[in-house]
Amino acid sequence: MAMATQASLFTPALSAPKSSAPWKQSLASFSPKQLKSTVSAPRPIRAMAEEAATKEAEAPVGFTPPQLDPNTPSPIFGGSTGGLLRKAQVEEFYVITWESPKEQIFEMPTGGAAIMREGANLLKLARKEQCLALGTRLRSKYKINYRFYRVFPNGEVQYLHPKDGVYPEKVNAGRQGVGQNFRSIGKNKSPIEVKFTGKQVYDL
């Protein structure tokens, strides 16, 4: 009787609510009551800030951000991506997608190796930097273009990269440079000339 009681404590509930998006299924088992017993009330400060930044920095004119298909299969990987962390339940996580011309082995940004499927692939990761690391590897070694998105706990999807449809290392006639200074560092003003002025040598 005691062993049956212990087994019931570690048996997951079978009546988890179904969702149309696969990333919601992993979060559906965490009800608000369970979160109260382990962590304090969620503070979606970063999510609110990201939503505000999204409204300000919209996609360039003439570029339509691609839509994320949640039914895209994931690569074949026998290990673990380290989990989506607790922040995926109260803030966000990231999804990277790409299309492979054939089934081939690639290195995971979290360690280990996986097999990408022929055609579309979708991989969920905890951090944006992991998506950038994997995307750089895909473009440099496999010559594969990629896209990644931010997914909020409420199911909202935000397209992140490449923002205007062109990768940063490529020339884009419509892209505005930020912090550009068309001179060598040797042509900067002497630091003593800008001392106590509140300016930097690269500002002049």
From Swiss-Prot:
Biological-process GO terms, alphabetical: photosynthesis
Transit peptide (first-last residue): 1-48
A matching Pfam family: PsaD
Keyword Glycosyltransferase appears in the UniProt entry: no
GO CC annotations, alphabetized: chloroplast thylakoid membrane; photosystem I reaction center
Main location: plastid
Superkingdom as given in the UniProt entry: Eukaryota
Subcellular location: Plastid, Chloroplast thylakoid membrane
Topology versus the membrane: Peripheral membrane protein
Keywords of the record: Chloroplast, Membrane, Photosynthesis, Photosystem I, Plastid, Thylakoid, Transit peptide
InterPro entries assigned: PsaD, PsaD_sf
Entries under PANTHER family matching the protein: PHOTOSYSTEM I REACTION CENTER SUBUNIT II, CHLOROPLASTIC, PHOTOSYSTEM I REACTION CENTER SUBUNIT II-1, CHLOROPLASTIC-RELATED
Family, as annotated: Belongs to the PsaD family.
Function description: PsaD can form complexes with ferredoxin and ferredoxin-oxidoreductase in photosystem I (PS I) reaction center. PSAD may encode the ferredoxin-docking protein.
Record's protein name: Photosystem I reaction center subunit II, chloroplastic
Organism of this sequence: Nicotiana sylvestris (Wood tobacco)
